[in-house]
Amino acid sequence: MQNKDNKFLIVGLVDDFIDQLSADLAYDNNLYYLNVENLINYSILEKQKLIDTCGVEYFKKQEEKIISSLKDYENIIACIKYSTFVEYCDKLRGIFNIVYFEIDEKNIKENKRNKFATENLNRIAFAERDKFLKNNCDITLKCDINNMKQNLKAFKAIQF
């Protein structure tokens, strides 16, 4: 089994918020920050061209290699889009301590930070995604999309 000390994957329902939160958490805890989506996009520069030339199956194999390579990182806080997390959840569970920063629907609707594009989730999709994350993460932390300091404090309080 992989040593998961100081290896955290941050997930949530609002990708832009999770990206910013992860960067802040990494800085605040003196850990390396990695956006998994950016790593995939950087590693596979011309995604559509690769798919057109080699097919979706080949692209998925390349993407899976990148996900597997995350095991080599240490002292890291990474973030990932919900859709990618769903696809590689089992593999990621063996690599990271996975933390779900839960935002309730009311908090999303009251979002004061315009820079976080709150996804237009209907109630059914919100409930399904929330349930999936709660069932597939090591820890769930309630958070406030409008209070980053509170979220950083909640993360510091967890013990693995």
Predicted features along the sequence, with ranges:
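Pre-Walker A (Motif I) flank of P-loop NTPase domains
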Residues: 3-8, 74
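ATP-dependent small-molecule kinase phosphotransfer cores
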Residues: 32-91
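Glycine-rich phosphate-binding P-loop
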Residues: 8-26
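Short glycine-rich anion-binding loops that position phosphate/pyrophosphate groups of nucleotides
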Residues: 81-85, 104-106, 146
